[in-house]
Amino acid sequence: MQPHLDNNSNNDDVKLDTLGEQNVLSSAENITLPEDTFKSYMTYLLYEMAHYKPMIFSFLALSVSILIVVIFHNVKACDVVFGFSIFVTSILFLSTLIPFNVYISDEGFRIKLLLEVITHRPAVKGKEWRAITDNMNQYLLDNGLWSTRYYFYSSERCYKFFRFLVKEKPPGVNVNSSVKDATSTQIDAPANEASNEVIKCFSFSSDPIFEAYFVKAVEVEKQAQQEYWRKQYPDADIP
């Protein structure tokens, strides 16, 4: 009698897991990301630039300099001074474009991303990444790390950021060159070796919490990669 009850319990757990996955995928389809909101990437970029304060200040300074030169164009001394000011403000304006697309390095943000991956266990190119992207965009806005809710333009860009994070050595880690690249090769390593390499690489991390989440997220990504490539090459006997 007991085995029969155990089987029913296992079946119920499987059904609940399946329903849970279906609910996550269904909700992910209803999420609106910047790529769905804006007509093109250029319009998205212009919108972001208009809400980026350093960009706004530089643009105003450049506009004022040009206006002053136009008004006082008959004064030779002013032409030299204001011409130089236009050059300087132009450099400042262009320099704001460099940090505009730099990866955010806030540790809380990165831990949040790792936990999102651990929780949702997304497949490679899976719809779960839409939910993760939406949550991360909201987190950035709520914590004042970005001025809009559109930091990640698409789920693909969020996934690329995660891959960048996985391959990056966290600050405070002191490892030798033979172990330094462990995270960049963990996807191709056998299952029983990947975790050991990652743990060895981060055994000197100054943040054990980040280290623990990092290792777990790497394992989730490794499983997703293996499943993805098994489906792509079913006859390749991929471990």
From Swiss-Prot:
Its main location: membrane. It is a multi-pass membrane protein. Residues 76-79 are extracellular. The chain crosses the membrane at residues 55-75, 80-104. It is found in: Membrane. Residues 1-54, 105-239 are cytoplasmic. Disruption phenotype: Cells lacking all 10 proteins of the DUP240 multigene family show no obvious alterations in mating, sporulation and cell growth. Keywords: Membrane, Transmembrane, Transmembrane helix. One of its GO terms (cellular component) is fungal-type vacuole. It holds the Pfam family DUP. Belongs to the DUP/COS family. Interacts according to large scale protein interaction studies with MEC3 and ULP1. This is DUP240 protein DFP3. The gene is DFP3.
